[in-house]
Amino acid sequence: MEPMKNHYLEIPEERKLRIFREEDEDFYSFWERMLDDKQSFYQQPLKRMSSDAWHSLHAFFTASKYGQHQASPAYIKRALELLNNVYLLANHSDQVVEFSVGHRHFSEVGNRSVAGGTMDAWLDEICLAMAARDWRCVELMTIMDESLVRLKDPFDVALVEFVNGVFGNSSALPELLQTVMEKSSPQYLESTRVPYVHSLFIPFVNVFVAIIDGDEAHYQEALRDALEAHYQFYMNEDVRYSPKGNVSLKLTGLAALAYDKYGWTIPETAYLPKWLVYGEQDRCSK
């Protein structure tokens, strides 16, 4: 079976390697500065951790695009270290929380605003944690109420409630799913959000439902449709250069879940790192 298409621009291998090396060097020099006791960049970690987690994820996106998978486990490990802290602090508002960043240890009062990302970012973070099999982080992200996420419209609310319902074993999943589908109607969305929702989120939901139902035929069809929708969306010039398009974190997390639960495999595609889906992080980093 031929690999599925991707939207990546053709770049000479030499240039790919140069770009990756620059990104990799930036990642390590950034964290060397951040964790240097003398420079004390991390005097106020609550203000930095969420954005610094995404700094690490951008390095992962670049490495994935250029096939440098051996570097990615370090990027993901740092991102999840920070995200665990972010959601631990957000879920323990007004309580003193002990946590670490690298070799440095902190004691801070929890604050709900430490999270405060968009629904899209929250979903990507959950799926990254799923792919890395960090179930503690998934739990921290899904026990919170939706007020910790910046919600733009009724669809955002419905999708957050559905995802939390899945991980909370809610008996109301059919009703929550129906609400997601209803709120995805253009009448509930800003016009600019319609293609975004229907290219990235509804395909994600369809794949998730197939996993919940244990239906492999539906899963394989929904996954291919979702990958094609991802490809078509990121072919748009407005988003073609977005690092987030290099890997579908949402689908990677679901594919890892399906593999662990049922042993279901994935098609050949740059958007789903096989080593991450199949839990080969240790082998990849050697």
What are these regions (language model features)?
Residues 1-10:
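Intrinsically disordered, low-structural-confidence terminal and linker regions
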